[in-house]
Amino acid sequence: MGTSKLIPDTKYIDKADNLDFAAAFSRIECHYFVNGIFLEDGFILKQVDKLMNIPVHIVQGRYDVVCPATSAWELHKALPHSTLEIIPDAGHSMGEVGIAKELVNITNKYK
């Protein structure tokens, strides 16, 4: 669902008109966030040593309200070998044009 996109997508808005879908989606989202996304605070940064020997590319939407850019910056600082791309016209969704384009660019480097 496109609840975390910078630019609203009408197909997702129309999908939310279905009350059964909207209720199910809302329950899942609430369960996820009420449970602290099922990770303790700082979990990823505490486990960062496991990422030291693999390539890490961080793609962050500038207007992501789910995972703030400060989180991406902290991860990037903890992983000196990582790359960080801030997509200026994106929110949280990997389906946003700028994020999708950057993910494809990164993936193509590994062909």
What function would you assign to each model-found segment?
Residues M1-Q47, I54:
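Alpha/beta-hydrolase
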Residues E29, D64, L75:
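Hydrophobic, well-ordered secondary-structure elements that form the walls
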Residues E40, V65-S71:
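Conserved alpha/beta-hydrolase "acid-adjacent" motif
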Residues L45-V48, A72, V104:
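Short amphipathic alpha-helical segments and helix-helix/interface helices
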Residues D49-N53, A78-L79:
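Short, conserved loop/helix-junction motifs that constitute active-site signature segments
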Residues L51-M52, I58-Q60, D64:
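Short beta-strand/loop motif that positions the catalytic acidic residue
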Residues A69-T83:
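Active-site-adjacent alpha-helix of alpha/beta-hydrolase-fold enzymes
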Residues S82-K111:
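Catalytic active-site module of serine/aspartate enzymes centered on a nucleophile-bearing elbow/loop
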